[in-house]
Regions:
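S-adenosyl-L-methionine
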Residues: 1-16, 31, 53-82
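Class I S-adenosyl-L-methionine
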Residues: 2, 96-225
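Conserved class I S-adenosyl-L-methionine
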Residues: 16-25
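Conserved short alpha-helix immediately C-terminal to the canonical SAM/SAH-binding motif I
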Residues: 26, 50-51
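Conserved SAM-binding loop of SAM-dependent methyltransferases across substrates and taxa
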Residues: 26-39
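Conserved SAM-binding motif I beta-strand of class I
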Residues: 41-46
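Short SAM/SAH-binding signature in class I
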Residues: 84-92
Length: 225
């Protein structure tokens, strides 16, 4: 049984894909997708020995060694062109780390049809990197699990031009304005309002930065001033 977060990631994996799951931990995601008959085969990549061994044992326990290869490798070094990987998932890492993994493996991405990225933070930095490196966001989603909000970015090769609002809030999420999106940014606005209250009135520039951030949230949530 996988988490709601991984379920949502899995929902964006196309039928019949050949998957690379980077930072696969216990290989939960590839195991789930293979057992449901959604994907042909998978590579579970892990850079840390402990999680790598856990993934190996888990794949063996599910009798899926023929379908899922577990590889000890750093990021996108876990696959080669001959593997014919069509989809890559990178979930549960910081946005900057995901960008770095993609940066280091950029040459490996030429034939990959789709990236499904689930950053735990710094989604804005990841979006900027994608734009600068000619990747295009084609879908986004958001959910809440155990009190945390998670955003998912579905990406393919292509150009996009993001506004400052798109970078911060997401080009699709900010248009859909789902209940989870509203909850996330209402919570963030409360934190910013509190922080603003701690800054002396004389610190005009510092205060203005927070005022602008709060105003941007109000605008994207369609809240009147």
């Amino acid at each position: 049984m996988i988490s709601k977060r991984l379920e949502l990631v899995a929902s964006f994996v196309p039928q019949g894909a050949i998957l690379l799951d980077v930072g696969s931990d216990h290989a939960y995601l590839p195991i789930d997708l293979v057992e449901r008959g959604k994907i042909e085969s998978a590579i579970a990549g892990e850079v840390v020995e402990g999680p790598y061994q856990s993934a190996v044992k888990n794949v063996e326990a599910h009798s899926l060694k023929e379908k899922i290869q577990v590889r000890l490798a750093n990021g996108l070094a876990a696959f080669e062109e001959s593997d014919q990987v069509s989809v890559i998932t990178i979930a549960g890492m910081g946005g900057r780390l995901i960008a770095r993994i993609l940066e280091e493996g950029l040459d490996n991405l030429a034939n990959v049809e789709r990236l499904i990225l689930q950053p735990n933070n710094r989604e804005d930095d990841l979006r900027i990197w994608l734009q600068e490196n000619e990747f295009q966001i084609v879908a986004e989603s958001i959910l809440e699990e155990a009190g945390k909000f998670y955003e998912i970015l579905v990406v393919k090769a292509g150009q996009m031009k993001l506004s400052a609002s798109d970078v911060r809030f997401g080009p699709f999420l900010s248009k859909e304005v789902s209940p989870f999106f509203v909850q996330k940014w209402q919570k963030e606005a409360v934190k910013l309002e509190f922080a603003l209250g701690q800054i002396p009135e004389k610190n005009l520039e510092e205060r203005q930065v927070l005022v602008d951030k709060i105003q941007a949230i109000k605008e994207v949530l369609h809240v009147s001033k």
